[in-house]
A protein has these predicted regions:
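Extracytoplasmic entry segments of secretory-pathway proteins
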Residues: 2-3, 32
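Sec-dependent N-terminal signal peptides
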Residues: 3-13
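Histidine-/acidic- and/or cysteine-rich, low-complexity loops and terminal segments associated
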Residues: 17-135
């Protein structure tokens, strides 16, 4: 009887599927075309619960976004930012994140500073520090 229960338990456990961790990712690269201009790529998982999350950039930046297109497991949106000053010292917000989707953010500045952060449903705004982070 115990053997039968063990086999039955293993059969049930093998059939369980877990949630695939597929975070959204925002990559922002400073460009040399103009001071405080950035090329960004917003990659949002196609398999998501609810409406697609959107990025709110600082008010001092004008945003030019292309139509999103699917690529692999993500919906890709290319964005051009032209800002009046650096992104450092300002916040970026992601609205409509789902419970199962976190958002990674990577900013590559021209002076080789790199900022990386994580946003989620409870903490959907991130402040980009003025000073570089050292870990």
């Amino acid at each position: 009887m115990n053997k039968l229960l063990v086999y039955l338990f293993l059969f049930v456990v093998i059939d369980i599927e877990s949630h695939e961790f597929n975070p959204a990712h925002l990559v922002i690269d400073a460009t040399t075309t103009a001071e405080y201009s950035y090329d960004a790529k917003w990659m949002y998982p196609l398999k998501n619960i609810g409406q697609r999350a959107e990025i709110i950039f600082p008010e001092h930046c004008s945003v030019e976004a292309q139509s999103p297109y699917p690529q692999g497991k993500y919906l890709i949106e290319k964005i051009i930012l032209n800002c009046d000053s650096s992104l450092k010292g300002h916040s970026i917000e992601v609205i409509n994140l789902s419970v199962l989707t976190d958002a990674l953010i990577t900013i590559n500045f021209l002076n080789d500073d790199i900022f990386e952060g994580l946003m989620n449903l409870k903490s959907s705004t991130i402040l980009i520090p003025i000073q570089a982070q050292n870990y």
